[in-house]
């Protein structure tokens, strides 16, 4: 059977699509390969969220296109967000591409690959934006065996002024609770111990299906599943974080005391311009409530600097808020002017040099805050999953704590007098803190 190589770019939501496509291809007897030079067909699942992601996607498309000349590749398929957003331009400007497939057509990947391998006409499929996978969709996990992402909804109904995702991914649509529960049980039976729940807006979960937010009820269904060690939430909107959700997180011991709560800014003028439906005071109250009701919770956020109209006073207000709230984790991004979004047409666009200068100032402050927050862990025992044997002879391991999401947060390096396996969950006593990472020893 033909062999397939797939390169997945961008966020975990895109990764789930890639895993479903690989699962469908494997189920239909395609051979999956990591060697692009030996692949009969190559798939690039692209990101198109901001300018740097678009540039990275295009660079990889050109790199893989070369295998049509110097490898055995007969078909190049481009999928994902960039494919949806710029389908016509990509097909016109990169002749090596055979098919453009939008995220609404993930389930058609087998048909599309066969079509391309048979040398049929080049074409695009980007019309439908209704698809969402379910518990019956095969998946070939690309994450470590003990962790998996589960997409609980697709699309987005938020119309933030800077973002094109609603046009790329379609309207928000939730999966039924029963579907998610069945998938999680199946993953746990296969050895997964950490489930990371994702969507464009996880806190909106259920509104379209049930007429009310039901993330709390979903967590209550998943919490008792035997063998499930950690449940983690990413991409939560501050204005939809209900008291019931806080209660569910506080009462279920295997829900990580960790929340990803993108704020994007703190100045109310900028939040309004961004069309973010939250004020600084509302965010402050929520964060205080989270820290009171869930003692020890770690809060991650993200901020955009250099949004159109952001003055030095607005930026200082953001820095003051960061200093006041002391987020445990924060990512800072410079505003990207995305065509087709309201923000792209706004006056008072900020010069790139000023954006970079504000980015570095915000990150400098956050590094100081992160170090201070991490130093509070010294002397504590925290739960860690072993991810790497760093030095077998010296008993040195690298892991990730329940307070850290994969890829985006820090690590824990520690020593152990007994051998450990990758995927083991252990208690580590922290004895040293860095800006993002912790160090310690296996707790006795």
From Swiss-Prot:
GO molecular function: 4 iron, 4 sulfur cluster binding; aspartic acid methylthiotransferase activity; metal ion binding; protein methylthiotransferase activity
Catalytic reactions on record: L-aspartate(89)-[ribosomal protein uS12]-hydrogen + (sulfur carrier)-SH + AH2 + 2 S-adenosyl-L-methionine = 3-methylsulfanyl-L-aspartate(89)-[ribosomal protein uS12]-hydrogen + (sulfur carrier)-H + 5'-deoxyadenosine + L-methionine + A + S-adenosyl-L-homocysteine + 2 H(+)
One Pfam family from the record: TRAM_2
Cofactor annotation comment: Binds 2 [4Fe-4S] clusters. One cluster is coordinated with 3 cysteines and an exchangeable S-adenosyl-L-methionine.
Assigned GO CC terms: cytosol
Transmembrane segments: none
Residues of the signal peptide: none
Keyword Transferase set for record: yes
Domain named MTTase N-terminal: residues: 2-118
Keywords associated with the record: 4Fe-4S, Cytoplasm, Iron, Iron-sulfur, Metal-binding, S-adenosyl-L-methionine, Transferase
Localization of this protein: Cytoplasm
Binding site for [4Fe-4S] cluster 2: 156, 160, 163
EC number: 2.8.4.4
GO biological process, one term: tRNA modification
Entry keyword S-adenosyl-L-methionine: yes
Cofactors, names only: [4Fe-4S] cluster
UniProt-listed InterPro entries: Elp3/MiaA/NifB-like_rSAM, Methylthiotransferase, Methylthiotransferase_CS, Methylthiotransferase_N, Methylthiotransferase_N_sf, NA-bd_OB-fold, Ribosomal_uS12_MeSTrfase_RimO, rSAM
Family matches, as PROSITE patterns: MTTASE_N (PS51449), MTTASE_RADICAL (PS01278), RADICAL_SAM (PS51918), TRAM (PS50926)
Residues involved in [4Fe-4S] cluster 1 binding: 11, 47, 81
Location of the Radical SAM core domain: 142-372
Assigned protein family: Belongs to the methylthiotransferase family. RimO subfamily.
Annotated protein name in UniProt: Ribosomal protein uS12 methylthiotransferase RimO
